[in-house]
């Protein structure tokens, strides 16, 4: 994943509506390094790879396992790959989510294109008989083996990388979203709004655990952490006259 956030001086800009782009983020001089694409690496606007890619991966795991919120989260990482650049978010991070009956481990390393299981990104469901590796580009099954008469024999049949057939899933989702908006009918959505919201919330929890440096615990009845410092990071501080509407 690209990460070219070298130090860049502030400049004047006349092309963009910069104030509107900033929105509720703190007012500061325009700097091209904090604009598109690199805004992802600055806390004022985003949450680094934990949230940028977390919502594209975590939703698959949460949907498959039928869960929404973890019992606890802890994270460790830092700026290890690019310690001297201007970015603020961790380029390297491991986050452990504890759910009932299983843990989910998130791991990212900016600048390293090769990943586990021969893929650049994805979710691995690790079971007793095999590992299912899946992302938006397809899936594969890697079997565990067992000793049978001195030979290592696969417990289940291996499934090589298989791509989904038919039209692009991204195109189908985009069309479905637009049609649902035009009909003003969220029930038409193939991927419900809640699916996206819980993925975003879990991703933000990872960053909150990283910022506190603690293992934080979630109270599902109150929709709050049990830690005061963690709760202070749930809501952003709005600037420039922007306010979060109260519903």
Regions found by a protein language model. Give the residues of each.
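Contiguous beta-strand/loop segments that form the cofactor/metal-binding neighborhood of enzyme cores
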Residues: 1-247
């Amino acid at each position: 994943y690209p990460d070219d956030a070298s130090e860049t001086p502030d400049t004047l800009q006349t092309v963009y509506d910069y104030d509107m782009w900033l929105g509720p983020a703190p007012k500061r001089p325009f700097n091209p390094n904090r604009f598109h694409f690199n805004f992802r690496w600055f806390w004022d606007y985003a949450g680094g790879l934990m949230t940028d890619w977390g919502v594209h991966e975590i939703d698959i795991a949460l949907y498959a396992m039928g869960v929404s919120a973890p019992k606890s989260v802890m994270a460790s990482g830092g700026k290890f790959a690019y310690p001297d650049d201007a970015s603020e978010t961790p380029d390297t991070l491991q986050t452990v989510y504890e759910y009932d009956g299983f843990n989910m481990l998130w791991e990212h390393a900016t600048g390293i294109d090769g990943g586990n299981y021969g893929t650049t990104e994805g979710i691995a469901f690790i079971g007793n008989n095999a590992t299912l590796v899946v992302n938006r580009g397809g899936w594969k099954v890697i079997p565990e083996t067992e000793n049978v008469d001195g030979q290592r024999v696969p417990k289940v049949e291996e499934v090589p990388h298989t791509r989904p057939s038919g039209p692009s899933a991204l195109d189908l989702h985009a069309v479905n979203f637009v049609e649902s908006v035009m009909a003003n009918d969220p029930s038409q959505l193939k991927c419900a709004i809640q699916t996206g919201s819980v993925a975003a919330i879990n991703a933000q929890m990872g960053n909150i655990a990283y910022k506190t440096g603690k293992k934080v615990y979630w109270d599902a009845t109150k929709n709050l952490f049990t830690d005061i410092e963690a709760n202070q990071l749930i809501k952003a501080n709005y600037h420039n006259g922007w306010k979060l509407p109260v519903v």
